[in-house]
Amino acid sequence: MPTKIIYGNNELDNIDKYINGRKTLLITSEGFVKRGLVNKVKLLTPYIIDVISEVKSHPEFKDLEITYHKIQNIDFELILAIGGGSVLDASKFFSVYNEKKEYQFVENIIKGKLPKEDHKLIPIISIPTTAGTGSEITPWATIWDMDE
């Protein structure tokens, strides 16, 4: 997917224009819920259909699997990721689309066990909140597997 960078003072206020009517899953961390950013975004656009805020630092497959099962039946067309590198990486994991909604398919794609051409990606709008690895512009995600 090509990357387009948009920046500017108060650019978040234009988020509805970028969502463009698509059913959106918002992925963030609990801190942004507590600070009121999620409520602000919901006021800016009516297209947020669900919020995932339990992304931990250094996301692990086992944690993402639990969240995957929570969202697998949500019919979203876009992911809005607001947070640091861990949130952006988790969003890339959830963007791997498969018709059967099977977790193992997604894990195998991420681990490189299946050809990357066999799937499509759900688009992501990333709003990075930290200066870090540049996760918002790369196709890679760091997902930890402490069991292997």
Language-model features, listed with the residues they occupy:
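Glycine-rich phosphate-binding loop
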Residues: 77-89
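Fold-independent oxyanion-binding glycine-rich loops
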Residues: 9-10, 29-30, 82-84, 127-130, ...
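A glycine/threonine-rich phosphate-anchoring loop and its flanking beta-alpha core
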Residues: 100-148
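Short Gly/Thr/Asp-enriched flexible loops that form oxyanion-binding sites at enzyme active sites
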Residues: 87-100, 137-138
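N-terminal loops that bind phosphate or other acidic moieties
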Residues: 73, 94, 112-113
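Acidic, glycine-rich active-site loops and adjacent beta-strand->loop/helix elements
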Residues: 58, 86, 97, 129-132
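ATP/NTP phosphate-donor binding region
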Residues: 1-78
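Hydrophobic/aromatic beta-strand patches that form the interior of the parallel beta-sheet core
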Residues: 50, 80, 123-127
